[in-house]
């Protein structure tokens, strides 16, 4: 290969989507990665790969990550694991069923390389427990929730009708647009703190207390409009891994379209005059148009240029704690699902956290770990990194206590306490603990053997006066910090300028040949990624009109003829048409089938009498007021 139009460095999700988009439009692309695997900053890694990754981060080989620490208990004989059985995402995300990325997966046919599973359980931590579970996505759910008073149900219904059906929506919101959402919900709808927390932090996945009304409502509508697109759930996760799996899917699509791939390859030099790029294997190539570079794989000769590009950009830090536990955590999941969301709102932890702690939980049925285990992906955008780590550890301890309390078969004995047994076992436990820690694998940022995140907090007596004696068995614990220039509210993605977004920054002495990409955002969903990619695409081609503007219909017909679905046993059943352990053949066909089977009126009817609804449900809370099953809210516009 003597020349190419575009050289892309890094196989992260943004770069992989870009490679596919360019290739399908006839652009000749060379796509390289310094790693031996795909995904870059979005990789899905095994435990052994994570050990090496931590070393590379702390040695400066991998940029934009820091403070990488891994702890693998080795004393207990039960902690025997097979590294390749784990797929741990560096930047885990969930996908709303109404989203640009999912639409692109369908349009580009990349979904054929992936499997999806439904996600419907969103939990909010409140009053030292996970008593509130966000599943009130139909009128029946709201009215049959015995934890809510009739008046609260009425206020909640008024708000949800307003959010999705009120023709005067914009006019009513306008005076509150920049006011904290809590004020709007309290003054206009008389909602109380528990309901506000669920709406803002779980359904809306807002990260801060002072989220504006305009932004919070858009986030809530995102959840509600995604419900019932493919089934009775708002979100999905990809099986066997998140963004890393999607990256590979788009790379495969790009390869089909003509992109050339080279892993374990670094850019060592580039002459902007001759446009010749040199690589670590001694090869070279002429670049006709642009070089796109992921910040994690920044060549040494461009370090000073990169520093100048970002010197006036606001950095944001995302602190993450990933814990693999020997519990499947089914207590927090619905039916045959294998994932759940847990959110700790601001000020809900003993550490008085200033920002939300958000947790994605996935168990063995998602393909990311063995059966009977689960991975907890927790994160926070707290900018005080010391405090962020303390918040994450506190959230872990709360989850641990709650899970053990819910699943314990000896709660009564633990509450009463067996002092004699405790006293007799103390010495033995201490000796066992000492022996168990002898073989622990520990790596921290300094290369020493200090345990990771050693802070602990005593749990209060408010946890139903029960603190389990046992601890969760941990397979692996990983902590690290990611640096990004994307605002957590995604404002500089949806409203980018040359002063707030790295993609639009010119690189000095590069003749406008080099573009740096953004690191992944702190956003828990995939929102903003397609917009970000389109920004790069436009800088290369001058327009986004032809972005994936390809007719895939003929290819789809041929694929369907040659790949008839094979019925085979699945570990779990299909939930709402999305995988619960098996595969799907056509998301579009699935949506059409779901719409045909769900043709009755919307769950919220604008002309219904609300008092009659409440009275009917009060008479018989086990049935819907019209004798129908639960139905979803309808989709609405996503912008004010």
UniProtKB/Swiss-Prot annotation:
InterPro entries reported for this sequence: FAD/NAD-bd_sf (IPR036188), GDP_dissociation_inhibitor (IPR018203), Mrs6 (IPR017230)
Lineage: Eukaryota, Fungi, Dikarya, Ascomycota, Saccharomycotina
Family: Belongs to the Rab GDI family.
Task of the protein: Substrate-binding subunit (component A) of the Rab geranylgeranyltransferase (GGTase) complex. Binds unprenylated Rab proteins and presents the substrate peptide to the catalytic component B. The component A is thought to be regenerated by transferring its prenylated Rab back to the donor membrane.
GO biological processes: endoplasmic reticulum to Golgi vesicle-mediated transport; protein targeting to membrane; small GTPase-mediated signal transduction
Record's keyword annotation contains rRNA processing: no
Segments of this protein annotated with the region Disordered: 414-439, 594-640
SUPFAM superfamilies: FAD-linked reductases, C-terminal domain (SSF54373), FAD/NAD(P)-binding domain (SSF51905)
Any single Gene Ontology cellular-component annotation: membrane
Top-rank taxon: Eukaryota
Biased composition (Acidic residues): 604-624
Family annotation (PANTHER family): CHM, RAB ESCORT PROTEIN 1 (PTHR11787:SF4), RAB GDP-DISSOCIATION INHIBITOR (PTHR11787)
Protein name according to UniProt: Rab proteins geranylgeranyltransferase component A
Keywords, in A-Z order: GTPase activation
Comp. bias (Low complexity): 419-439
GO molecular function: GDP-dissociation inhibitor activity; GTPase activator activity; Rab geranylgeranyltransferase activity; small GTPase binding
Pfam families (UniProt xref): GDI
């Amino acid at each position: 290969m003597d020349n190419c139009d575009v050289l892309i460095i890094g196989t992260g999700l943004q770069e992989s989507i870009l490679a596919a988009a360019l290739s399908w439009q006839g652009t000749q692309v060379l796509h390289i990665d310094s790693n031996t695997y795909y995904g870059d900053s979005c990789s899905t890694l095994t435990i052994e790969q994570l050990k090496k990754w931590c070393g590379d981060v702390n040695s400066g080989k991998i940029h934009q990550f820091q403070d990488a620490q891994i702890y693998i208990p080795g004393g207990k004989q039960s902690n025997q694991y097979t590294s390749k059985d784990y797929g741990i995402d560096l930047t885990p995300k969930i996908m709303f069923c109404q989203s640009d990325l999912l639409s692109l997966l369908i349009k580009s046919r990349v979904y054929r390389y992936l499997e999806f599973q439904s996600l419907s359980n969103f939990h909010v931590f409140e009053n030292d427990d996970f008593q509130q579970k966000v599943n009130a996505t139909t009128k029946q759910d709201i009215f049959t929730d015995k934890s809510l008073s009739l008046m609260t149900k009425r206020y909640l219904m008024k708000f949800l009708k307003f959010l999705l059906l009120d023709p005067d929506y914009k006019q009513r919101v306008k005076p509150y647009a920049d006011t904290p959402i809590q004020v709007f919900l309290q003054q206009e709808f008389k909602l109380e703190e528990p309901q506000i927390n669920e709406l803002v932090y779980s359904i809306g996945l807002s990260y801060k207390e002072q989220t504006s009304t305009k932004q919070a409502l858009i986030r809530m509508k995102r959840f509600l409009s995604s419900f019932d697109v493919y089934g009775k759930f708002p979100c999905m996760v990809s099986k066997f891994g998140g963004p890393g799996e999607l990256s590979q899917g788009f790379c495969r699509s790009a390869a089909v379209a003509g992109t050339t791939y080279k892993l374990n390859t670094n850019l060592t030099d580039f002459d902007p005059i001759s446009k010749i790029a040199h690589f670590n294997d001694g090869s070279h190539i002429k670049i006709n148009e642009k070089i796109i570079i992921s910040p994690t794989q920044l060549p040494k000769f461009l370090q000073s240029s990169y520093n100048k590009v970002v010197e006036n950009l606001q950095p944001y830090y995302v602190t993450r704690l990933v814990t693999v536990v020997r519990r499947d955590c089914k207590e927090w999941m619905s039916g045959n699902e294998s994932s759940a969301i847990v959110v700790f709102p601001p000020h809900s932890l003993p550490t008085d956290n200033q920002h939300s702690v958000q947790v994605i939980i996935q168990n063995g049925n998602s393909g990311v770990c063995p059966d009977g285990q689960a991975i907890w992906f927790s994160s926070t955008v707290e900018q005080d990194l010391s405090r962020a780590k303390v918040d994450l550890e506190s959230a872990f301890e709360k989850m641990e206590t709650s899970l053990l309390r819910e699943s314990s078969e000896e709660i009564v004995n633990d509450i009463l306490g067996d002092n004699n047994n405790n006293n007799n076992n103390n010495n033995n436990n201490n000796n066992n603990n000492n022996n168990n820690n002898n073989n622990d694998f520990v790596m921290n940022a300094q290369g020493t053997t200090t345990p990771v995140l050693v802070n602990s907090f005593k749990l209060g007596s408010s946890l139903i006066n029960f603190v389990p004696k046992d601890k969760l068995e941990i397979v692996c614990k990983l902590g690290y910090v990611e640096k990004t220039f994307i605002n957590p509210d995604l404002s500089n993605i949806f409203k980018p300028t040359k002063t707030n977004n790295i993609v639009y920054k010119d690189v000095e002495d590069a003749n406008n040949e080099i573009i740096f990409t953004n690191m992944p955002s702190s956003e828990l969903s995939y929102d903003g990624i397609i917009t970000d990619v389109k920004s790069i695409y436009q800088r290369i081609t001058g327009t986004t009109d032809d972005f994936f503007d390809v007719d895939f219909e003929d290819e789809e017909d041929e694929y369907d003829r040659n790949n008839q679905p094979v019925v085979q046993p699945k570990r779990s059943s299909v939930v709402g048409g999305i995988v619960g352990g098996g595969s799907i053949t056509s998301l579009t066909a699935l949506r059409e089938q779901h719409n045909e089977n769900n043709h009755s009126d919307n769950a919220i009817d604008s002309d219904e009498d609300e008092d009659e609804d409440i009275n009917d449900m009060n008479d018989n809370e086990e049935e819907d007021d019209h004798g129908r099953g639960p139905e979803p809210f309808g989709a609405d516009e996503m912008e004010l």
